A protein has these predicted regions:
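Alpha-helix termini
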Residues: 27, 75-78, 99-102, 291-303
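N-terminal glycine-/serine-/threonine-rich phosphate-binding loop
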Residues: 14, 38, 47-141, 146-153
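Conserved phosphate- and dinucleotide-binding cores of soluble alpha/beta proteins
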Residues: 55-64, 117-326
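Short polybasic linear motifs
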Residues: 33
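Cationic, low-complexity basic patches in intrinsically disordered or flexible, solvent-exposed regions
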Residues: 2, 8
Length: 326
């Protein structure tokens, strides 16, 4: 599930959004002339204005990244386009509309129910993944990320759509990631603290045990934001397990001699993804790594989990572009 701003907040980071909603204790019983009242109101007001300003900066950064990604990569004669579920994708769709081209012959493939609603609300034609004609390859797919490392490996699944996001990316010639600068880190699990994993409800308890054996610290089934004792369900009617691990090594780290095989809970990105995927009951893992679309095509495949490029909106209004190795 997504928040009104388009981002999922798990129980682990939920307290960070409640600061501005706190009321000042005893405010109604204080006299208007009390210095304490004016001080509290001033601090609260300043905090609110600051947070509002920062939120506005982040949204403008997302808009800039979305526009740049579409301007540089959108095929003008596209027949099928994947549209992801990240909060930045709102601005990707906006940028597609702003191109001013004929989109009547283009079908847009959503990665979830909210993504589909976004497509339809923009006046574009949505087609579900399972309704695609056999053998259809998407011209391109755009999606966001919860975190991106130096090698363009991604963590996704904060919005509980990771399985559909992955199959759409794997069916596209190119996958483009769009995010704001906060999502770019040198290693995965630096700022974003857990890996989302989609699991069969009947196997959830066993998956939690297996994740602990792999080194996860307190993995947990994600609950609904508005019902803390009810597990969140994906569009596939599966659960999401959020599994914290130590920050993940890159291939470059392993090449210089660091051990990412899981000893002492230290993993390299792809090694951990493969280990989790082998757990019975796991549908898919919120780690996107491995080949890009062009790399997969060179080997006879269709698409890849890794984006060919990632666009990051910066606080100053500029856009930073990272490209995957050829």
């Amino acid at each position: 599930k997504l928040t009104p701003t388009g981002e999922f907040l798990s129980p682990r980071n939920r307290p960070h959004i409640n600061i501005c909603s706190r009321s000042v204790p005893g405010l109604s019983s204080l006299r208007p002339s009390s210095p304490r009242v004016f001080f509290s109101l001033s601090v609260s007001s300043n905090r609110t204005r600051f947070r509002s300003t920062m939120a506005s900066i982040v949204e403008e950064a997302k808009r800039a990244a979305g526009k740049a990604a579409v301007d540089n990569h959108y095929p003008k004669d596209a027949k099928y386009v994947g549209i992801g579920s990240g909060s930045t994708i709102v601005y990707v769709v906006e940028a597609i509309k702003d191109l001013g081209i004929d989109t009547s012959v283009t079908k847009y493939v959503p990665t979830g129910s909210q993504s589909k609603q976004l497509i339809v609300s923009a006046g574009l034609t949505a087609i579900d993944f399972d309704a695609l004609p056999q053998g259809t390859v998407l011209d391109i797919a755009f999606d966001g990320a919860d975190e991106v490392d130096d090698e363009l490996n991604l963590i996704k699944g904060g919005g509980a759509c990771l399985f559909q996001e992955k199959i759409v990316a794997l069916q596209a010639k190119e996958f483009i990631c769009v995010a704001d600068s906060r999502k770019l880190q040198s290693r995965l699990l630096s700022n974003w603290k857990y890996i989302p994993i989609e699991v069969a409800p009947i196997a959830a308890a066993r998956v939690l045990t297996a994740l602990t054996l792999l080194g996860s610290i307190d993995p947990a089934v994600r609950m609904q934001p508005d019902a803390k004792t009810v597990p969140l369900r994906t569009d596939q009617n599966f659960y999401i397990v959020d599994a914290p691990f130590a920050s993940l090594l890159t291939k470059a780290d392993v090449l210089i001699g660091q051990d990412g095989s899981g000893k002492a809970g230290v993993w390299e990105v792809e090694a951990l993804s493969q280990a989790i995927k082998q757990i019975p009951g796991v549908l898919d893992v919120g780690i996107f790594s491995g080949l890009t679309g062009p790399q997969a095509q060179a080997l006879g495949g269709i698409g890849g989990q890794k984006p060919v490029a990632a666009y990051f909106g910066m606080p100053d209004g500029s856009v930073s572009v990272r490209k995957a190795a050829p």
